[in-house]
Amino acid sequence: MLEARVVKRLGALDLAFDLSVGPETLVVAGPNGAGKSSMLRVLLGAVRPDSGRISLDGRTLFAARIDVPPEDRLIGYVPQDYALFPHLDGIENVAFGLAHLPRRERRAHAGAWLERLGAAHLAHRRIAELSGGECQRLALARALAREPRALLLDEPFASLDPSARRELRASLRRSLQQWRLPALIVSHDPDDAMLADRIAVMERGRILQQGSTAELRRAPASAFVASFTAPERETSS
């Protein structure tokens, strides 16, 4: 379980949030500038909170005298821009994050994750040749290949066309249901609520309301909250 209760002032933004994510998917929804990506940077360890506590599976990652480095937090991260290396092919990009493994094992491990995600055909493709959806699959494979205990995704579908967005949402939902990792997705798109077991709606650095998708649809705290809860989930085969 990923748990966080932190406060951080970032320029004009006062960021304060209290979240607990078990083996489920939490979608943090809100407009651009709400503080969603800043929240992810705090959880990852890229930005140090002013106060509070962050823990993962009972292990303290941040507290008054503890600040575990990002590379040791066992949190997978899929950035909005994918952060893939254009001079490497698909399997090399996935293997890049596996420096903790012996060199001879890295490609085999990366290839296994591409296979699991139905992306083995991308192993020897150059990044410039790939669509946004294909880049997203590689970024997800790279994050999961490190076998994290929690997964964070920053606007994972923002740069995709509507067709690719629907396909990737369905694929990611199936994968998250299979692995049962604590997963936190931030998004400004109300349609991404279909991925959620729970939704938290954020504005100006604060969580306004959080609960199950059914709870927020049934009793939203405001019209603003209601605008970020999608209609009934799409079903997938």
Predicted regions and their residues:
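Conserved ABC ATPase "signature" C-loop
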Residues: 205-206
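Conserved ABC ATPase signature
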Residues: 126-130, 134
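ABC ATPase NBD coupling module
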Residues: 60-76, 100-103, 216-220
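Conserved ABC ATPase "signature" region
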Residues: 59-63, 105-122, 173-174
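A short, proline-enriched helix->beta-strand linker immediately N-terminal to the Walker B motif
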Residues: 145-149
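ABC ATPase "signature
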Residues: 210-211, 219
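ABC-type ATPase nucleotide-binding domains, specifically the catalytic core motifs of the NBD
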Residues: 88-107, 116
